[in-house]
Amino acid sequence: MGKPRGLRTARKHRSHRRDQRWHDKDYKKAHLGTRWKANPFGGASHAKGIVLEKVGVEAKQPNSAIRKCVRVQLIKNGKKITAFVPRDGCLNYIEENDEVLVAGFGRKGHAVGDIPGVRFKVVKVANVSLLALYKEKKERPRS
């Protein structure tokens, strides 16, 4: 049997479309409300947090490296996440108990590249851009 055709089939078409929408991954993600439940940021693009410790995450095969990351406890809800520290030597600008600004890391909530389970990256440290510290345009504020 094909789809219903002809007059007076609009209700059937509409309800079928409504049912089939739930099989679309993006529609489901947008309408189920899991953005607020499952996402540590709670639907926001960035979040501030306190650095708990520095960690090295081993890259997935076939690469062999230790990617420099930090464990961060978010201020808004207390959830703990692992955030990647981009660029060479930038881990030296971050100390424990620093306040950092964390953003998403590409791929809409999925891990990126060869770093397993890391979905976030550090953008600012102590309200100073990590890129500015790296390029030596700014210095860390004295604490």
From Swiss-Prot:
Subunit structure, interactors included: Component of the 40S small ribosomal subunit.
Gene Ontology MF term list: structural constituent of ribosome
Organism from which the protein derives: Dermacentor variabilis
Main location: cytoplasm
Xref: PANTHER family: 30S RIBOSOMAL PROTEIN S12 FAMILY MEMBER (PTHR11652)
Residue pairs linked by disulfide bridges in the UniProt entry: none
Chain positions with Hydroxyproline modification: P62
Record region (Disordered): 1-26
Entry-linked Gene3D superfamilies: Nucleic acid-binding proteins
Pfam family, one: Ribosom_S12_S23
Bias kind Basic residues: ranges: 1-20
Protein family (similarity comment): Belongs to the universal ribosomal protein uS12 family.
Localization: Cytoplasm, Cytosol; Cytoplasm; Rough endoplasmic reticulum
A cellular component term, taken from the record's GO annotations: rough endoplasmic reticulum
Alphabetized UniProt keyword annotations: Cytoplasm, Endoplasmic reticulum, Hydroxylation, Ribonucleoprotein, Ribosomal protein
Protein's name according to its UniProt entry: Small ribosomal subunit protein uS12
Biological process terms in GO annotation: cytoplasmic translation
